[in-house]
């Protein structure tokens, strides 16, 4: 277990990986562990793609963020084979047929996408309270 995980941003995690102080698998395991503990409290990650993320671990070796866990916003971001709902019940079964350019760039940079985050319906409000997945709570104000 990597207890200091929450003290690092993506750049800091990439630096630890580059120095081989931790492995991509260990980082992903910690991200999954933290998600399983915290998400029931805040409801931020309705789509968990842990198995898909494990497949991504060997991709893009040598990329600047190779092995850094990453969450993709479920708002106009397509990752082939996953639901792209945009926070709407209208799209709750919309499986992406392709991976969009921005998501490809994240993957090309070596980021490991392990889930999609909750979003307001079509991004139309400033708070995340969609009917589809329910509200996301402020982690600093539980």
Regions found by a protein language model. Name each.
Residues 2-142:
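Gly/Ser-rich catalytic/binding loops embedded in alpha/beta enzyme cores
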């Amino acid at each position: 277990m990597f207890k200091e995980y929450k003290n690092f941003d993506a750049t800091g995690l990439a630096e630890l990986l580059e120095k081989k102080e931790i492995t991509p698998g260990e980082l992903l395991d910690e991200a999954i562990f933290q998600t399983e503990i915290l998400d029931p409290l805040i409801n931020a990650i309705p789509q968990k793609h842990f198995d898909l993320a494990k497949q991504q671990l060997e991709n893009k070796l040598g990329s600047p963020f190779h092995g850094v866990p990453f969450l993709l916003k479920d708002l106009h971001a397509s990752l082939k084979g996953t639901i792209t709902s945009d926070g709407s019940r209208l799209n709750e079964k919309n499986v992406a047929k392709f991976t969009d350019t921005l998501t490809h760039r994240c993957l090309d940079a070596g980021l490991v996408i392990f889930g999609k985050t909750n979003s307001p319906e079509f991004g139309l409000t400033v708070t995340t309270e969609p009917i589809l997945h329910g509200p996301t709570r402020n982690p600093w104000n539980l």
